[in-house]
Swiss-Prot record:
Predominant subcellular localization, coarse grouping: cytoplasm
Sequence intervals crossing the membrane: none
One of the record's GO cellular component terms: mitochondrion
MF annotations from Gene Ontology: glycine N-acyltransferase activity
SUBUNIT field: Binds to microtubules.
Entry EC no(s): 2.3.1.13
Keywords: Acetylation, Acyltransferase, Cytoplasm, Cytoskeleton, Microtubule, Transferase
N6-succinyllysine PTM sites in chain numbering: 41, 48, 124, 128, 140, 255
Post-translational modification N6-acetyllysine, affected residues: 41, 43, 48, 80, 83, 124, 128, 140, 150, 255
Database matches in PANTHER family: GLYCINE N-ACYLTRANSFERASE-LIKE PROTEIN KEG1, L-COA N-ACYLTRANSFERASE-RELATED
Protein name listed in UniProt: Glycine N-acyltransferase-like protein Keg1
Length: 295
């Protein structure tokens, strides 16, 4: 096992992961931001170097003091050979299987290995799979071969124009974390709110302020750079607000040069239609999250 710390090695890793897009997307996006200053202070592990097979991005051990906090105890994994990475992922130096944790990857093929390791460590594993999309501007720059017409999601639905007398673009404040948490599908608890607070504090966030001067629609970035946690207050839905705030987010992050990608639940047809309005690329791989709980 090797822990990559030098800027040179991490840049080599980023360049290598780029060649394996889109399957490496979740890890690539994380390494990109590690190379931009590592704002979440993440740790990069590889099984060997420089000819690595498997990469794991995780928090530092000193930042994983709460055994029950799977929002913080998150591992991002990419492997060139998903069926033969069990020994590396099974190492206690790589993944602490005694904690409540989650593993995220753009490779569903990792499932059998993760489920096997969960069973070996007397734990329960729950898998969530979603559609994975890449913003067109990112695909053009990083993986132009994905710009095939059959991958481009386009919606012909008409948009409701933004009433700029009532609504104003703004950024979220950490004090808005409770509001975001209340509508986040994966949240709704104290630990998720703490995670959201850190995301708002660390990365650019975007919202639309309503007539009351409070956020009515918003979207954030998580610790991997993924566009996440979008939401709209129920009374303001069906006004295309989430489209307008997501469009603002994409325009701003494009200027910063950030890779942009997001997942959508397979049953969330409303957000899928919005993705169509934004003209994003549906990737051939999927967004995967395995929640592991020791019994």
């Amino acid at each position: 096992m090797f822990c990559l710390q030098s800027s040179q090695a991490l840049q080599v890793l980023e360049n290598s992961l780029r060649k394996h897009l889109p399957e490496s997307l979740k890890v690539y996006g994380t390494v990109f931001h590690i190379n931009q200053g590592n704002p979440f202070k993440l740790k990069t592990l590889v099984d060997k170097w420089p000819d690595f097979n498997t990469v794991v991005i995780r928090p530092q051990e000193e930042d994983m003091t709460d055994d029950l906090d799977h929002y913080n105890n998150t591992y991002l994994v990419y492997s060139k050979d998903p069926k033969h990475c069990q020994e590396f992922l099974g190492s206690s130096e790589v993944i602490n299987w005694k904690q409540h944790l989650q593993i995220q990857s753009s490779q569903s093929d990792l499932g059998k290995v993760i489920e096997s390791l969960g069973a070996t460590n007397l734990g329960k594993v729950k898998h969530k799979q979603c559609f994975l999309y890449m913003v067109c501007q990112t695909a053009k720059k990083l993986a132009p071969s994905l710009m095939d017409a059959k991958n481009l999601v386009v919606s012909r639905n008409k948009l409701t124009p933004l009433d700029q007398q009532l609504f104003k673009f703004a950024s979220l404040d950490v004090t808005h974390a409770a509001l975001v948490n209340s509508l986040w599908h994966f949240g709704g608890n104290e630990k998720s709110q703490k995670f959201i607070e850190r995301c708002i504090f660390t990365f650019p966030s975007f919202c639309i302020m309503g007539p009351e001067g409070t956020p009515v629609s918003w979207t954030l970035m998580d610790h991997t750079g993924e566009l996440r946690m979008g939401g709209t207050l129920p009374k303001y839905r069906r006004q295309s607000l989430i489209y307008h705030v997501a469009s603002q987010q994409i325009q701003t992050l494009e200027k910063l040069g950030f890779p942009m990608y997001a997942h959508v639940d397979k049953a969330n047809f409303t957000v899928q239609r919005m993705v169509g309005l934004l003209g994003q690329i549906l990737l051939p791989c999927t967004w995967n999250q395995w929640n592991c709980v020791p019994l």
